Amino acid sequence: MTIGLCACGSDSDNLPVDAPVADTYGEPSQSSAVPSSADTNISSADASSPETEAVADAEPLRDATPVCLVPRADGTATASNDVAVIDYSHMSDGYVCANYTGTCPKVKLRITGPDTVVYTYNLHGGGYETFPLSSGDGYYDVTIYENISGTNYATCLYADLDVQITDAFSPFLYPNQYVNFTADSKVVAKGQELAEGASSDLEVITRIYDYITQNITYDYGKASDPPTGYTSDVDAILASGTGICLDYAAVMASMLRSQRIPTRLEVGYAQDAYHAWISVYTADTGWLNGIIEFDGNVWTLVDPTFGANTDDKTLKKFIGDGSNYILQKMY
């Protein structure tokens, strides 16, 4: 079986300081209380009835109310010039914001963290955009580049940051260019609908995973020639019911983050195909990496694309011990 889910084009722009080309998916899209129950009067005669015991033993439901964190560019800590701003007021929450107001039609932002992994994004102007600090605590270099000719770029603005993230899960709960949602997003409403009545985060993950794999079909035409710098419009994907690997992962990640479940959108290679999948965190299990199914004890690698398009036997053979997946970046 040959699996080629996301044939992806790549930019050939030359950034200074040996910066890599833009990520294949680097261009941005435009854009807990427990529920109260009714008071119940139970007489002493009813207290030991089977119905009462069943109620007493029932597992409490989790709160399905969405929580959509909102990135902010407060201006309290910035690097700026006359055409660009890097706002790191909330770097302790695991993100920075950037805005470009100049006239250059092609602008990129590059983030290099303490693990030396380089993330390159397209930066559009017209307002602040949010970028995760995915590499944890440490020193980050954040640089904005303007195209000067052909594929050549020059530094426009930079900031060197010493980042200490207060909550390690924050980068994977806030929206960003790759996982782009708000409280008004349709994916958030659908996530709440799917989470209603669930008793645990694992049940929510299962319900959302099942919904995505059963209701979104793979778009082979789009995968064969994806737009340069593609990122997902998650509501459009939900409405159309079709998408490529990044779309599956972005929709599921948006739903789960809005349900307070830390979720990493991960990009790398599945054998020789450039691919996207997700990993999730629960308090009971820690990070669930490489999840396809739950056997009662173990989850591994959440890959909603393969889950939707591959039979169980083939899927399990491909996943194996996870060695077919090579993680490069996470958002």
Predicted regions: what is each one?
Residues S200-T206, Q214, D233, R257-R264, ...:
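Loop/turn elements at helix/coil->beta-strand transitions in domains of secreted/extracellular proteins
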Residues S199-I205, D219-T228, T263-Y269:
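Surface-exposed patches in mature extracellular/periplasmic domains of secreted proteins
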Residues Q214-G243:
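Short, conserved helix/loop micro-motifs enriched in His/Cys and acidic residues
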Residues V204-G221, G307:
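Glycine-rich, acidic and aromatic/proline-enriched surface loops and short helix-turn segments
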